Swiss-Prot record:
InterPro entries for this protein: ATP-synt_VA_C, ATP-synth_a_Xtn, ATPase_a/bsu_AS, ATPase_F1/V1/A1_a/bsu_N, ATPase_F1/V1/A1_a/bsu_nucl-bd, ATPase_F1/V1_b/a_C, P-loop_NTPase, V-ATPase_asu
Database matches in Gene3D superfamilies: 2.30.30.650, 2.40.50.100, Bovine Mitochondrial F1-atpase, Atp Synthase Beta Chain, Chain D, domain 3 (1.10.1140.10), P-loop containing nucleotide triphosphate hydrolases (3.40.50.300)
Gene Ontology terms describing biological process: proton motive force-driven plasma membrane ATP synthesis; proton transmembrane transport
Name of the encoding gene: atpA
Enzyme class, first EC level, given as a word: translocase
Protein's organism: Chlamydia trachomatis serovar D (strain ATCC VR-885 / DSM 19411 / UW-3/Cx)
Protein name (Swiss-Prot/TrEMBL): V-type ATP synthase alpha chain
Amino acid sequence: MVATSKQTTQGYVVEAYGNLLRVHVDGHVRQGEVAYVSVDDTWLKAEIIEVVGDEVKIQVFEETQGISRGALVTFSGHLLEAELGPGLLQGIFDGLQNRLEILADTSLFLRRGEYVNAICRETVWAYTQKASVGSVLSRGDVLGTVKEGRFDHKIMVPFSCFEEVTITWVISSGNYTVDTVVAKGRTSTGEELEFTMVQKWPIKQAFLEGEKVPSHEIMDVGLRVLDTQIPVLKGGTFCTPGPFGAGKTVLQHHLSKYAAVDIVVLCACGERAGEVVEILQEFPHLTDPHTGQSLMHRTCIICNTSSMPVAARESSIYLGITIAEYYRQMGLHILLLADSTSRWAQALREISGRLEEIPGEEAFPAYLASRIAAFYERGGAVKMKDGSEGSLTICGAVSPAGGNFEEPVTQATLSVVGAFCGLSKARADARRYPSIDPMISWSKYLDSVAEILEKKVPGWGESVKQASRFLEEGAEIGKRIEVVGEEGISMEDMEIFLKSELYDFCYLQQNAFDAEDCYCPFDRQIELFSLMNHIFNSRFCFDCPDNARSFFLELQSKIKTLNGQKFLSEEYQKGLEVIYKLLESKMVQTV
């Protein structure tokens, strides 16, 4: 039998429709409450999604084969919650926060009705006591800390405790398991409370204590096209829509490896199973370029593949953001990668159809936009009571059918995010990786980033705008060349076209398989961008289009070689010197 609270409300199945059950209830229940359905000597986890009189509709998170009319249903009395505490990092969970490595020990395939603790109860943690007897604390205040990898994991007063608590007893510093009572307290009403290292929080409610503040720190990801053309601030939101095969998942894998954040929560809610396996095989062997440790030391993975029931997709995306919010409350910078929010939206559409709700555009529920907005609004930078700041940056991959950016999920996402990184099938087919199309992408953070970088790089904002103008003009001239040929345009237009192509090939594109070019530090980007602007501001003298193309191809080859050399090495400095000499040989004037 499953563990439930003292409330023992029960019911029985009246009707089953896929994973949606209609249940007659004998007692009090509430929407969002967890229920367990009896089938074949096991219990399947479910959630109440609609209450009508003495009947409720529940969505079951697992395969419902074998459920019959009259099957017993038990209601737990608590909402769908995440278990939060030390030990989540390096964890690999399913959408219900079961540890997959533990389930793998019991069976090759996931058995339905098997649930395990998200946090290991046997692991011993070195606990350092911070609170003192007599101190008055409230939700989110620190009781003590444990060392989780390189992070000081704060053991906090549970966020479900909305009253002030006077501490009456604290444990001494030492080695304890997570279920050890580390402090006791008394509320103003006289209620006695005991605190362990673990707390629970409903995943569909925002997890926040503190003041939301404007984002003011750049999130360096090592991709020049993102850091320069479509920058994102820590605490910002952005999306990566693109058709099948455009490189959304590869882009998200790059972000999880190289983004300058403390912790990455990777939520694979609808990825193909093979891509999830690739993550699990690669990440333990990859090194974090910022710390030199394994990438798994800063990563938490929620794997919910397309082959799992649709209801679990919704729980997995909310579970991921709840874990991310929990670590943000410790003053850490978090990146949540959701791949893909379209699969979540499809799950909403399927459940909405079974509930017989009035459909919206393309049969998605009418509340789709508000659900997506509520999800992205849980991101942001937060200032805690102790003055520390944490941030949660959200990146959602969107998979529009046929690459149609006008479909409802993409449009609902674009209305709430701060940056749009549109992936193009045409660029992917042309092997222009990363296949982010700078012509359709945008960022609301450009001016903020320019303001931050103004002291270090004067005129950064204007330089980025100039580069964008060259890309736009070059694209227009390229279309004319396809019609009338190179002989039908002026030499000045030919020069603009070749400069835009040079910028695209040598700056916006990167080689993910090159040890140096796969990750470009910000200082290196600034130097390379300075070189590109020097080329933009220079006028050259050519006799004919062929000579111009030959010169820019030679220049492109040398800059590409430079990108593959170790930054500030002797070879790098020599290569840079050769490039500037080559420019001087053809330069007429500098603007």
